[in-house]
Amino acid sequence: MHDLFYCKLAGDDAERCLALAAVLQNAPDFVLLEQVFAPEADIFCFAFLPVQKPFRFKCDFVYGQIISSGEHWTAAETAALEAAVNRIAEKMFQTAG
């Protein structure tokens, strides 16, 4: 596994990470492949449809969020995934001012 990017809008807040993972499950560009619940983390495995590759969104209750994949992602593919996740996070976590 290698890290792809860090979603700053979700940060390492477990509630925000879990909320983002829940919204990704219903987003049209994402397909939930697997969900694993462990005492130290909740792990959500998704396929990102525009590039047809899987990634893992881990909400680690000790270390924070980890967005990673066992597959090779090009810089352009990673940027597309990051932009899609950030668009969703921006809508969720908009704050005034």
Task: Provide a role label for each language-model segment.
Residues 20-24, 70-97:
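Ampiphathic alpha-helical segments that act as solvent-exposed interaction surfaces
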Residues 1, 63, 95-97:
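Short, low-complexity, intrinsically disordered N-terminal peptides in bacterial proteins
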Residues 7-11, 48-50, 68-71:
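Short beta-strand-to-loop capping motifs
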Residues 6, 31, 49, 56-58, ...:
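Compositionally biased, low-structure terminal segments
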Residues 54-80:
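Intrinsically disordered, low-complexity regulatory segments enriched in Ser/Thr/Pro
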Residues 38-62:
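Short, intrinsically disordered low-complexity segments
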